[in-house]
Amino acid sequence: MSQRKFFGTDGIRGKVGADQMTPELALKLGWAAGRVLARTGTKKVIIGKDTRISGYMFESALEAGFSSAGLNVLLMGPMPTPAVAYLTRTFRAEAGVVISASHNPYYDNGIKFFSNDGSKLDDEIELAIEAELEKPLICAESQFLGKVSRIDDARGRYIEYCKGNFPADQTLSGLKIVVDCAHGATYHIAPAVFRELGAEVVAIGVEPNGMNINDKCGATSMGAIRDKVLEVNADLGIALDGDGDRIMMVTQEGDIIDGDQILYILALDAKERGLLKGGVVGTQMANLGLELALKDEGIPFARSKVGDRYVMELLKELGWRIGGENSGHILNLDHGTTGDGIVAGILVLAAMRRSGKGLQQLIAKLKMFPQVLVNVRFEGDKNPLEADTVTAKVAEVERELGERGRVLLRKSGTEPLLRVMVEGEDKETVTRLANAIADAVKAAT
């Protein structure tokens, strides 16, 4: 495969005004993508965004680029990433575009694409777009320019889609739920979804100002929702990230429920209903406790590289339907084509209603193992992963842990860091062993 210059594993992302995230690039990207997408299909593209102040700028630039290439543009305004994927399918658009940096701070932004079926763009199309980016921008003749319009009912369409994932014969009546929207794209969606299903909703993180997205709130900062759940004596809390593709939850007692625990709930619910097709895909960072608990239930488990793109690839390869990351990206291919925080929350609530159990009860048999992560900075060209002393230390630690523990070493993709992760049943033992490996890494650099 050719080397990518712009696209990463999840589109293009960076600090606004620096890196690659400039209005100039967005304009050219819209034109280049338009040139590729206009070769076939409906010549129609959808653009959605989160609530970052820079979204206006990038939306206008992309809009101009697509129009100059002859594509018609449908604008959604602030909408969750999974909503763009869904509406791209229902509008029969050639592609969907999301302007978001997901869980990052407001001063970052990004651009990612969905294909006409709501999945991530194929590598071949991304490479074709990159090839067009190298060419000079040539505007289409006036009679072939694209038009721009707005989808006025995008919010209502997506709310109804989300509600459709909950059993029609059930309601959430009697449940008090705190919903934290991270001042992001779900601020006008998620509270309405759960209210219309019958829950009493206490909404926080629903006052975006362009600069407070993910700021001490949402799925990456659980303190605010935990405090609110305890303050109002809610039955549970649902925290989403800035673009709505991640979910974390909080029990009535204030315990944090992460993506691994949500996967466990969804897998057991699907198994009990005879709907589990195969097993569950997690990542290299998935807790060993999840793997062992699923094994006890006779459910196969497979690990992919970190990143929802790789989870999706392995799901398709194995023909399975449920997968995700401990960070809260949850994929259920029977209910969508991408990670959807609101829908994942609805599926957990449906499992609660069917079982008659509370959130804490649903994970009672899942024993999460302590994980210790140590970041070791290294300099120079040496790869500490190849050092004999490091390899020997890892082997020694793995022997001590046996089948009830795990070691993972991986290099950061953005910094000169080696991440040492050790997990096992005892926190003190795991900490000691992680530090021992970290010391071996330091000595080898």
Curated annotation (Swiss-Prot):
Cofactor(s), names only, from the UniProt record: Mg(2+)
Co-factor note (free text): Binds 1 Mg(2+) ion per subunit.
Biological process terms in GO annotation: carbohydrate metabolic process; peptidoglycan biosynthetic process; UDP-N-acetylglucosamine biosynthetic process
Pfam families for the chain: PGM_PMM_I, PGM_PMM_II, PGM_PMM_III, PGM_PMM_IV
GO cellular component, one term: cytosol
The UniProt record lists the keyword Magnesium: yes
Keywords: Isomerase, Magnesium, Metal-binding, Phosphoprotein
Primary role: Catalyzes the conversion of glucosamine-6-phosphate to glucosamine-1-phosphate.
Molecular functions per Gene Ontology: magnesium ion binding; phosphoglucosamine mutase activity; phosphomannomutase activity
Listed SUPFAM superfamilies: Phosphoglucomutase, C-terminal domain, Phosphoglucomutase, first 3 domains
HAMAP family named in the record: GlmM_B
Gene: glmM1
Chain positions recorded as Mg(2+) binding sites: S102, D241, D243, D245
NCBIfam families: glmM (TIGR01455), PRK10887.1 (NF008139)
Reactions the enzyme catalyzes: alpha-D-glucosamine 1-phosphate = D-glucosamine 6-phosphate
Top-rank taxon, per record: Bacteria
Catalytic residues, chain numbering: S102 (phosphoserine intermediate)
Annotated positions of the Phosphoserine modification: S102
Protein name: Phosphoglucosamine mutase 1
Gene3D superfamilies: Alpha-D-Glucose-1,6-Bisphosphate, subunit A, domain 3, Alpha-D-phosphohexomutase, C-terminal domain
InterPro entries registered for this protein in UniProt: A-D-PHexomutase_a/b/a-I, A-D-PHexomutase_a/b/a-I/II/III, A-D-PHexomutase_a/b/a-II, A-D-PHexomutase_a/b/a-III, A-D-PHexomutase_C, A-D-PHexomutase_C_sf, A-D-PHexomutase_CS, Alpha-D-phosphohexomutase_SF
Record PTM text: Activated by phosphorylation.
Homology family: Belongs to the phosphohexose mutase family.
EC number assigned by the record: 5.4.2.10
